[in-house]
Amino acid sequence: MKKAVLLATVFCGVVGLTSCCRIVDCCFEDPCAPKPCNPCGNKKDKGCSPCGVYTPSCSKPCGSECNPGVQGPQAKGCTSLDGRCKQ
């Protein structure tokens, strides 16, 4: 019985993590992105997995995984020499 409960808990935890937007995955501000590019704002884009795939990077256009037309300052390659985002 304990094994069944443990397996159910693990399974539900894994499914839950992959099917929803976790705060640790994407609910943060990309310092290089305009407000519309906040990944939590469009975490459930059609045809795209949940926003766990979002990786904030100044060198990558915001929303490129789901919306190729959405671009922010990242599209201009605004990274500094040390790889951090320019303000």
UniProtKB/Swiss-Prot annotation:
Pfam families: Chlam_OMP3
Membrane topology: Lipid-anchor
Keyword Secreted among UniProt keywords: no
Subcellular location, principal: membrane
GO CC list: cell outer membrane
Gene Ontology BP terms: regulation of cell shape
Compartment list: Cell outer membrane
Signal peptide interval: 1-19
Keywords: Cell outer membrane, Cell shape, Disulfide bond, Lipoprotein, Membrane, Palmitate, Signal
Assembly mode: Part of a disulfide cross-linked outer membrane complex (COMC) composed of the major outer membrane porin (MOMP), the small cysteine-rich protein (omcA) and the large cysteine-rich periplasmic protein (omcB).
Stated name of the protein: Small cysteine-rich outer membrane protein omcA
Source organism per UniProt: Chlamydia psittaci
Organism placement in taxonomy: Bacteria, Pseudomonadati, Chlamydiota, Chlamydiia, Chlamydiales
Gene name of the encoded protein: omcA
